Amino acid sequence: SFAGAEAANASQLQSIARQVRGAVNAVAGQVTGNGGSGNSGTSAAAANPNSDNTASIADRGTSAIMTTASATASSTGVDGGIAATYAVASQWDGGYVANYTITQFGRDFDDRLAVAIHFA
């Protein structure tokens, strides 16, 4: 039924949104020195955020594993999933500019994907 299909798609989109939010928050936390998921130390990127430090995370339905050396997290899985990349473009005293790239993997592109980024 139409209602069943809508409910299934809404659930799938909510799952993707949670994955993206977790991915971006984990990477942003690593680069800005606010911690991040799965890592108790400060990454090299957090200690010295500049244009040479790039952090990425990929999630394809499994939990990500953070590594401190490159502030990168990745996982493997089946067809589909997302990747979020965060890179510091420039910085100055008291601030910086960063670029985010969100990529969706899989056979079918879902143009309903929306990303909201909130910093605490």
Curated annotation (Swiss-Prot):
Keyword annotations of the record: Cell wall, Secreted, Virulence
Regions of compositional bias (Low complexity) in chain numbering: 40-51
Disulfide bonds: none
Presence of keyword Secreted: yes
Region (Disordered), start-end ranges: 29-59
Keyword Cytoplasm: no
UniProt GO cellular component terms: extracellular region
Intracellular or extracellular location(s): Secreted, Cell wall
Domain of life: Bacteria
Family: Belongs to the mycobacterial PE family.
Domains as described in the record: The C-terminal domain is required for interaction with TLR4 but not with PE9.
Protein name: PE family protein PE10
Native organism taxonomy: Bacteria, Bacillati, Actinomycetota, Actinomycetes, Mycobacteriales
